[in-house]
Design a protein with these regions (language model features):
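Extended, low-hydrophobicity, polar/charged segments
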Residues: 1-161
Length: 161
């Protein structure tokens, strides 16, 4: 994989046992709709890797990654419940980069800078393969659900509206 952005090369190098086929879209794939249009797949086959912070009853905060189908919205109350927290909030741009090593809009489902819990919405299973960000807002890669499960090791739950 030559001529990839540094973040995509770093992600590909961090993953073993999976041949990552990164595709670059210079016009960008910032939204699920943009990505689906560029790839030619349903919006539901796009994985949005969202970074949220869950907060427990003592006020302790923990960043988590939530994998959501591109056509659905995260339900923050369901996420909090699944995470054993009292509430959740969207992570700031600085929190996203600190927790994952990637910028918002390009966060991949695995290969993060720090150990971080990952949750995946059950409705991602409607498509196989799915497409996820490869470290930047202009790169994506296809991945089977089996490989996504093996590499991201998510807690599968219903966390969308």
């Amino acid at each position: 994989m030559t001529d990839l952005p540094d973040a995509s090369s770093r992600l590909a190098a961090a993953v073993t046992g999976f041949e990552m086929e990164v595709r670059v879209f210079p016009e960008g794939t910032k939204t699920a709709e943009d990505a689906a249009r560029a790839i030619g797949c349903p919006v539901s086959a796009i994985v949005k890797s969202l970074v949220f912070v869950v907060v427990d009853e003592e006020g302790n905060e923990e960043p988590v990654v939530v994998l959501v189908p591109g056509d659905l919205r995260l339900d923050t109350a369901l996420l909090a419940r699944e995470a054993g927290a009292t509430r959740s909030r969207r992570a700031s741009l600085d929190e996203v980069r600190a927790a994952t090593g990637y910028s918002a809009g390009g966060t991949p489902p695995f290969g993060h800078a720090t150990p971080i819990r990952v949750f995946a919405d059950e409705r991602l299973r409607r498509n196989d393969p799915v497409w996820a960000a490869a470290g930047t807002p202009t790169t994506v890669f296809p991945i089977s659900l089996a490989d996504l499960d093996r590499l991201a090791r998510p807690v599968w739950a219903e966390v969308t509206e």
